[in-house]
Amino acid sequence: RYLPT
């Protein structure tokens, strides 16, 4: 979503 995790 926000972080590329």
UniProtKB/Swiss-Prot annotation:
GO biological process terms, semicolon-separated: neuropeptide signaling pathway; proteolysis
- Which top-rank group of organisms is this from? Eukaryota
Q: Which cellular components does GO assign to this protein? A: extracellular region
Which UniProt keyword terms apply here? Hydrolase, Neuropeptide, Protease, Secreted, Serine protease
User: In its keyword annotation, does this UniProt entry include Hydrolase?
Assistant: yes
**In this UniProt entry, which cysteines form S-S bonds?**
none
Where in the cell does this protein reside? Secreted
Keyword Secreted belongs to the record: yes
* Tissues in which the protein is found: Found in the crab pericardial organs.
Q: Name one GO molecular function term.
A: serine-type peptidase activity
Function recorded in the entry: Stimulates cardiac output and hindgut motility, modulates visceral and skeletal muscle in many arthropods. Also inhibits activities of the human peptidase neprilysin (NEP/MME).
**Protein name per UniProt:** Proctolin
